[in-house]
Amino acid sequence: WTSLHSIAAYGSETYQTVAETLNNATETDTIYTEFRIIASMNEGNYVSLDDENGFGYSVDNIHPATPELTSAEHEDMDVSLNWQYELEEDFAYHRITSLNSIDNTISNEHSFTLDGHDEHWVNSVDYNGNYSDNTESIMSMALGQGANLRSFNVLPDDNSITNVMASIEGNATGVIGEGVAANYMEDIGWMGSLDEITSCGAYWLIVNEEDILLTTGYPTDRTIPCELHAGANLISFYVFPEDNSVTNMLSSLGDNATGIIGEGVAASKING
């Protein structure tokens, strides 16, 4: 038995106190603690009988502090993410979640080799399996030399072209959207009719050399409808069902959709 604490008797018929548990219940195991009471009196010590003992458990459901992403950088296709975290006494590890994998680490950095496109966010996890809120997400987008047709699943609150393109500033020479465009001018910045990047839009990103665009923000709202007008529309697809075939993705448009064009690929609908 482990002694927890003592309280003074003051002539009451009943007493109430707060007793500490020695372990917390977890997601997979409810750990009960047995309590007994010893009354120390002039006549001697009186111990509660075994069938009079109490049982209880405690749950740690306090979420850990959320890490803060501080930087993302790359060399060739190798990307490094860094974050700050105020260490708490019950800290267990950080969980890094991406579109295709989950990694755990006790450090404040994570590195990976980019294969086309990925998005990462971090949670801190404590010994009792509690997760912090998600950090902001970091989107990593590989770009080939020349023109690249891309859309954005992650955007910062400041979605200006200057902010979104900051990581490739100097290498990027132009961005073209539907009916809008902007060119990068050294010592001046971005100039043109394209002021901001939106979740519904698709864009041609033009770069001098192979690069990676790194953008920090939050996943875009998947419920926003992207309106289509008659003719050609330059839009993004930011929700992909298990069946992401062209037939399924455009099924809601019926016979109204006659064709779709991507970067270096295209498909036309032929009746009959």
Question: What feature does the model see in each segment?
Answer:
Residues 1-31, 107-115, 192:
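Signal that preferentially marks extracellular ectodomain short beta-strand elements
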Residues 23-50, 90-94, 112-132:
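Beta-strand-rich modules
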Residues 55-59, 137-140:
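Short beta-strand edge segments in extracellular beta-sheet folds
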Residues 76-91:
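Conserved aromatic anchor
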Residues 87-106:
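Extracellular low-complexity, O-glycosylation-prone stalks/linkers
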Residues 137-272:
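N-terminal exported-region signature
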